[in-house]
């Protein structure tokens, strides 16, 4: 089943005025006349207040679902588009407050409601889920790809919908909602058909796309006997997760003209296909002093020195504000061995301290990625956009499953006994009463000490996610480190000169495609840029609550005065109050500007911002006592080697001076003899003394 709700603002709180439900069966056509609808103003004869009528809309929707479940004698899944952050919040509160006979089991992590299961006793009757978790994207775009025959998504003037004109606008409002429900039904039906046809997998058996991708990988491409994926314990996960930094986003030059914007074709899938992966069971090494870095493969805590001569440093580092920067200086961090080796080749000093070592193994993902990428190309060539879309999202979703963090925020709706237990025995964030004997509680999971409390998500293997992202940074660095690189964001670069033809292709995995030719562009901060493409198109991106207040002129003004800030009004139309489970509209004032110097330091020429320099740091605070002793010992070794090197250099210099003096003396004697002895034999008259290097001098036996 698929469903939708429509809301109106009453005292800045969203209240449902309409709801609809459509039964979708495999192989059967769907029509809008099959949609059950519930409209608040239809109850105006029996209910005076809108609050009561709004409650009745959801009450009858739930009642209809319960009736279908009893008639069909089957458990049903009902999908909403954006259930996690909108419809699901409305339903969770409604069920907790108005359906006391039901037991609710919400699956909520990090303030995202993935599933809301409804029980009668111990029997699950139905469950609500978010279609976005399986099919990410706007409903209009999904429908265009998967079910174009059902027509386009409609629109309504939300700002014109008021309590006073709800009744008069009934037809247009219900038509809009019914079209959304019809499109969602078509999208889910087509997706279910495709996945069943290709893989014999029912999408209803998985909540998220990454889980679905993992299931298909395991079923069709994975050989567990030859490549068992190790699930880390708490100590392993906590250590290796420090090496899971993600993508690299930075702005280097704030303004440029006549530029080239490139994207890599499926960067992470390419890395998963071509690069080795950490396999086997990790082995802990508490002291790697004196060990050869080249012989290691795994995740290492290392003491690192990046010279100030490196303009665009390679190794990431999280500062005290949890900002990911790429600094010069002296610091300690946990890194994938391959990026430490790469950094050393760039001129970094790398001293391994401790870490988990794995087996270096060929990637288990090669067949999975190759098959999906080739199938996607074939689908695009044949014009089958629906299949091409499915192959693309599957290929790009597997990696994220391995990086799921076991430490998360869990939200429960529970009775008073459970509420009191969580207050006493969990790392509580908040707890509030929703209704009699119904409480909402949020707490942190997997934060207790001891292995008995460790309950990570199934198939969480952070070593794979960390290796993939680190290898991607290695792959991108030759392009990022170019002098003409203006901006980078994980799998893209903006360059002043074109890339060579041999690395360009729109259809080869891992090669670059020209996304845009940029006439002029402003790159003021990570994920905050504006450029005019060569065809005149304006492309603008800004990350932050005030993004609707940002225009091309703002980028021009901000570039002229980077420190400029202004207070702007911002409407947050769908803010969730987790204490009350209300979705509210909130108007706030936000200071709009860019944060200078948090990732790189701006460089000015005659008061014009022209470039950036890396931040220089010194931070050894993460070292424990053993680590400090190891670093002290390694530093002493380095100092000793430097001293020995200086002594040898001085000896070499002394020998070279002696050779030079000896050469000068011999030449002087020879010249004097030549001038005084006119009867020199012919053989000697051709003799020349040539200068010699110290090494030649030693070889000659002087």
Please identify what each model-predicted range represents.
Residues 678-702:
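Eukaryotic intrinsically disordered, low-complexity regulatory regions enriched for S/T, P, E, and Q
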Residues 10-641, 645-647:
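Conserved acidic
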Residues 630, 637, 644, 651, ...:
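Heptad-repeat coiled-coil/leucine-zipper oligomerization helices
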């Amino acid at each position: 089943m698929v469903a939708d709700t429509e809301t109106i603002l009453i005292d800045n709180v969203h209240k449902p005025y309409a709801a609809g439900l459509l039964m979708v069966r495999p192989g059967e056509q769907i029509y809008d006349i099959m949609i059950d609808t519930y409209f608040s103003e239809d109850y105006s004869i029996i209910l005076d207040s809108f609050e009561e009528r709004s409650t009745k809309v959801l009450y009858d929707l739930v009642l209809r679902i319960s009736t279908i479940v009893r008639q069909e004698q089957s458990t049903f899944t009902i999908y909403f588009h954006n259930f996690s952050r909108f419809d699901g919040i409305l339903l969770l509160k409604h069920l907790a407050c108005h359906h006391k006979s039901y037991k609710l089991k919400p699956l909520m992590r990090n303030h995202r409601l993935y599933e809301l299961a409804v029980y009668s006793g111990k029997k699950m009757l139905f469950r609500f889920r978010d279609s976005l978790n399986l099919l990410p994207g706007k409903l209009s775009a999904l429908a265009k790809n998967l079910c174009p025959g059902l027509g386009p998504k409609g629109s309504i003037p939300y700002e014109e919908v008021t309590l006073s004109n709800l009744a008069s606008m009934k037809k247009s409002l219900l038509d809009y909602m019914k079209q959304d429900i019809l499109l969602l039904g078509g999208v889910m039906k087509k997706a279910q058909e495709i996945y069943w046809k290709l893989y014999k997998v029912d999408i209803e058996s998985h909540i998220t796309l990454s889980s679905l991708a993992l299931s298909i990988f395991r079923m069709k491409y994975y050989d567990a006997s030859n490549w068992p994926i190790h699930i880390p314990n708490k100590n392993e996960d906590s250590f290796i997760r420090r090496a899971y930094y993600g993508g690299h986003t930075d702005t280097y030059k704030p303004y440029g003209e006549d530029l080239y914007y490139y994207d890599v074709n499926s960067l992470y899938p390419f890395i998963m296909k071509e690069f080795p992966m950490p396999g086997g069971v990790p082995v802990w090494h508490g002291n790697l002093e004196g060990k050869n870095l080249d012989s290691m493969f795994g995740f290492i805590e290392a003491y690192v020195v990046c010279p100030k001569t490196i303009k665009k440093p390679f190794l990431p580092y999280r500062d005290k504000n949890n900002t990911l920067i790429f600094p010069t200086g002296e610091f300690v961090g946990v890194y994938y061995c391959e990026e430490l080796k790469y950094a050393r080749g760039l001129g970094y000093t790398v001293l391994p301290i401790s870490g988990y070592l794995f087996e270096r193994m060929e990637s288990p993902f090669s067949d999975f990625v190759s098959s999906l990428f080739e199938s996607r190309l074939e689908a695009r060539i044949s014009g089958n956009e629906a299949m091409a879309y499915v192959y693309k999202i599957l290929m790009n979703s597997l990696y994220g499953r391995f990086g799921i963090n076991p430490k998360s925020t869990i939200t429960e709706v529970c009775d008073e006994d459970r509420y009191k237990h969580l207050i006493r025995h969990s790392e509580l964030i908040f707890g509030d009463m929703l209704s009699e004997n119904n409480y909402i509680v949020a707490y942190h999971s997997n934060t207790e000490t001891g292995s008995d409390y460790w309950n990570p998500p199934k198939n969480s293997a952070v070593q794979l996610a960390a290796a993939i992202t680190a290898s991607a940074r290695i792959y991108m660095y030759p392009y990022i480190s170019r002098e003409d690189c203006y901006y980078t964001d994980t799998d893209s670069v903006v360059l002043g000169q074109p890339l060579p033809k041999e690395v360009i292709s729109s259809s080869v995995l891992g090669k670059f495609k020209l996304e845009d030719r940029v006439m002029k562009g402003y790159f003021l901060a990570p994920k905050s840029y504006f450029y005019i493409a060569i065809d005149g198109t304006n492309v603008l991106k800004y990350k932050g609550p005030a993004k609707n207040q940002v225009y091309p002129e703002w980028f021009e003004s901000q570039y002229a005065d980077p420190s400029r800030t202004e207070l702007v009004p911002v409407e947050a139309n769908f803010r969730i109050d987790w204490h009350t489970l209300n979705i509210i509209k909130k108007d706030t004032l936000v200071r709009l500007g860019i944060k200078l110097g948090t990732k790189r330091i701006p460089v000015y020429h005659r008061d014009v911002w022209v470039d950036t320099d890396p931040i220089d740091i010194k931070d050894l605070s993460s070292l424990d006592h053993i680590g400090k002793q190891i670093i002290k010992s390694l530093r002493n070794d380095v100092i000793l080697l430097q001293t020995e090197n200086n002594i040898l250099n001085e000896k070499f210099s002394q020998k070279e001076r002696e050779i030079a003096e000896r050469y000068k003396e011999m030449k002087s004697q020879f010249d004097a003899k030549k001038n005084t002895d006119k009867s020199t034999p012919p053989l000697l008259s051709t003799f020349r003394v040539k200068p010699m290097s110290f090494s030649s001098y030693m070889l000659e036996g002087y």
